[in-house]
Amino acid sequence: MVLRYNSPRLNILELVLLYVGFFSIGSLNLLQKRKATSDPYRRKNRFGKEPIGIISWWILGIALTYVVDISNLVIYALRVPNWWPCKTTVVCLILFLLFWIIVLISCADSKALPKNADSILKAYRLSVLYVWAIDIVFETIFIVYSPHPNETFQGIVLADHVARLVLCVFATAIYLTYRRKRHTHDPLDFEERQLTEESNVNENAISQNPSTVQLGVSASTSNFGTLKSTSKKPSDKSWAEYFRSFSTLLPYLWPTKDYRLQFQIFICIVLLFLGRAVNILAPRQLGVLTEKLTKHSEKIPWSDVILFVIYRFLQGNMGVIGSLRSFLWVPVSQYAYRAISTKALRHVLNLSYDFHLNKRAGEVLTALTKGSSLNTFAEQVVFQIGPVLLDLGVAMVYFFIKFDIYFTLIVLIMTLCYCYVTVKITSWRTEARRKMVNSWRESYAVQNDAIMNFETVKNFDADDFENERYGHAVDIYLKQERKVLFSLNFLNIVQGGIFTFSLAIACLLSAYRVTFGFNTVGDFVILLTYMIQLQQPLNFFGTLYRSLQNSIIDTERLLEIFEEKPTVVEKPNAPDLKVTQGKVIFSHVSFAYDPRKPVLSDINFVAQPGKVIALVGESGGGKSTIMRILLRFFDVNSGSITIDDQDIRNVTLSSLRSSIGVVPQDSTLFNDTILYNIKYAKPSATNEEIYAAAKAAQIHDRILQFPDGYNSRVGERGLKLSGGEKQRVAVARAILKDPSIILLDEATSALDTNTERQIQAALNRLASGRTAIVIAHRLSTITNADLILCISNGRIVETGTHEELIKRDGGAYKKMWFQQAMGKTSAETH
């Protein structure tokens, strides 16, 4: 007889070899879907597509040798009475066959591995090549110590060993040849390197300047006003990359300073292991109870019945242990949700102005609501994936001890097949669900745009257009949803088929053993109960994997937002701005949103303390940009801005912005009361201070005319108030803030002439003793300014007082003055 069928020690070594192989393949699958390489100068595949075919055929050949081995054993066992090889041999053959089938499927899966020999050999170097080398040693030992075959059965076994040895040596030779050729070939030639560099430069230019991406014009409303994304697809990430991304947020999930919550987490983990123990004791107790009942004893086994009921009462997520764990986990989950949600909002608010200019509010808000999904992801990994793996592992060990290694093999193969099918189908479903989620976000964003711009929609009578646009987005979402639901039902059918087939084999084998006296009826009950009990974690694994994928998809956008970095950041240990006088100096300041189109060029001026500086000029000339860079929404490209000889880039953003009061051209208010909106400038202000600020802004009497007075709600973005009322509320906020520097961006542009005079007087009082920079559309409002800067195409073309500029013949300011004067005279005439 050949050595392998008489030597359990060699079979044990085979199991060790098999473990190395399975562990390596598992590591490979964990890291799959990574890019083949990020090196732009990587060598080309010198073998082309041929090594893929050679490797695949080699793996198939190895698998077929084990098929021949198993078939040979079965035929010999049927021919020879009362003969069967040792169990370890059967298990080794089946597991090795399963191993090489997994390798073959993974190699053939284009998504699991790159499609070139270079990447295949790199990816499998740690998993398959080690198995090749070890297998060569084992096969050599088997062949050397095998006796001379005396019959066909032994000859076939020996031939299989020789075939595997030849295939392993052949595969190793291919790899060594590949390695030698790889090191002798030259890198990419100069032209290829140059083209690669140019391509990388273009890609970097696009990524750094998103505005260079062209807008696509389409008749479809789904592309209305959208940019084509050039970012990396989330599906290109591996599981390791996903866990690495999530790990950056784990500190916010762990209650670092709350020891009571930490103790509750410890109790939850203890309950988790207690639940696993009960999962063993419950079916075992049912088997014991069945054994006693089948003995036809006149004594009722009360203790066994009560013990079984207790186990059932404790078992499962609906049992006492599961319910207690869920109850104790509630405050931990709420802590994590609050930490993630507040962290997300804080991060978005800390992002620079350019992010908020390019964002879609609906999409960002949707992403921020997914903080619970991130919390769910962490909870699933710790308290759901762990228990499932423990239950399956404990079941295999228990079956091996209680019954037979064949039952362990059944559970193992069932688990592998079930998990593999679940992962593959779910991976296919993931892309469909990702499209569904993205289409839902798009429909939500369209709906949000229509509601947020309600007045514009009504002004242009665009109700039908918006309904059609939203309906088109909903149709796309429903189409993707149908695909997701179909794939879900298909997955359920396949999972049910795998479990039912495995259960049938286990029941038949157990029935055989009970029939011939190897096991008792109680053992059959234990097996059947435990197998049915295993269906729950297996089914739950499918649901869990889908839920895990869903959580990942739902939080992808949130993680992308967390990965966004502000372009304007404080220097480490930056001091607070100390405003003593309020002197503002712009020194050779240049700035551009897009490097191809400068907005400001060599801006120089000094705003003396207590003086009013007026900025006038054509729209788009850069006036508002001056205010933005003074508030440091953007950093200047060159030059510097100082306040009292302190560069604003060297101080904290909070101290800078708290020293500046702003009255914007288009004031936006929170959907709250008037009192809240005015008090927003100074949360510690008393009602008397608020009333005084409102009186100074000429809005107090108007507020008192509202039904609810200061408690009147202003509506979304202040739509319940007129433009003049909103502007006066903004002025009241600036007055209440009492800043050292005032920025007025056409603050009276939305007011009538009478109110403008009143507000102008209030603004003059506000600016008294403070540095004020005013953007003026109506030149009549800045005639008393201490310095007027006339800006055109990002440059200061004229400076002076009103009297000085009005006397300059051909000057830009004089032209604007007379144009407005003539327009006003013409309007009064008509």
Swiss-Prot record:
Glycans are attached at N150, N350. Gene3D superfamilies: ABC transporter type 1, transmembrane domain, P-loop containing nucleotide triphosphate hydrolases. Keywords: ATP-binding, Cadmium resistance, Glycoprotein, Membrane, Nucleotide-binding, Signal, Transmembrane, Transmembrane helix, Transport, Vacuole. It is found in: Vacuole membrane. It is a multi-pass membrane protein. Its main location: membrane. ATP binds at Y593, G617, E618, S619, G620, G621, G622, K623, S624, T625, I626, M627, R628. Glutathione binds at R429, T430, E431, A432, R433, N492, I493, V494, Q495, G542. GO terms for cellular component: fungal-type vacuole; fungal-type vacuole membrane; vacuolar membrane. InterPro entries: AAA+_ATPase (IPR003593), ABC1_TM_dom (IPR011527), ABC1_TM_sf (IPR036640), ABC_transporter-like_ATP-bd (IPR003439), ABC_transporter-like_CS (IPR017871), P-loop_NTPase (IPR027417), Type_1_exporter (IPR039421). It comes from the Eukaryota. Residues 584-818 form the ABC transporter domain. Involved in metal tolerance. Probably involved in the transport of metal-bound phytochelatins. Compartmentalizes cadmium within vacuoles, thereby protecting cells from cadmium toxicity. Belongs to the ABC transporter superfamily. ABCB family. Heavy Metal importer (TC 3.A.1.210) subfamily. This is Heavy metal tolerance protein. The gene is hmt1.
